[in-house]
Amino acid sequence: MRNRFKLPEHLTMGNFVSAGGAHASGTKDGGNDSGLAAYVASLIDRTLDWNDIKWLRTICGSMKIVVKGVMTAEDAAESVRQGVDGIWVSNHGARQLDTTPATIEVLPEVVAAVSGRCEIYLDGGICRGTDVFKALALGAKAVFIGRPVLWGLAHSVSKGLTVLLSSLH
């Protein structure tokens, strides 16, 4: 949002239309940015802490609890101490954070910190089968992909998805 991005007047951001106001068009009055970053930040509960995992456990019964977004050994160790069933190494696409490390780079330290006490999953930066192989070899139990699937579908629907999945084989 640093570049004061603004959609053309005839376009809207469909995911924000129900929120009303200027956020649907990606604009706001005043300030040096589009206002979208502030709007999205206002949706995040900053009071969340490690104690919330204990609370989740009380209402989830036998449902597995997986913490997503773990990128450090310290957070991995604390996740295990809190009793999670799995850790999902993810930088949430890193497209908004230009200094976030790649998930494959932090995976070995997360695996070492966990020492087999829970399962570890990974997403981010997975574009071909060798990426999947590396993540599994470094200790991930499973690897997830997101954006490449959407790219394949957007490019040529089922044929694009078939090509993408073939490249992961």
Regions found by a protein language model. Give the residues of each.
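Glycine-rich beta-to-alpha transition loops that act as phosphate-gripper elements at the mouths
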Residues: T47, V66-A73, T100, C118-V132
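Glycine-enriched alpha-helix->loop->beta-strand junction motifs that scaffold or abut catalytic
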Residues: I59-M63, V80-A94, V114-R117, G139-V143
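Generic beta-strand/beta-sheet core signal
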Residues: K68-V70, V89-H92, D123, I145-G146
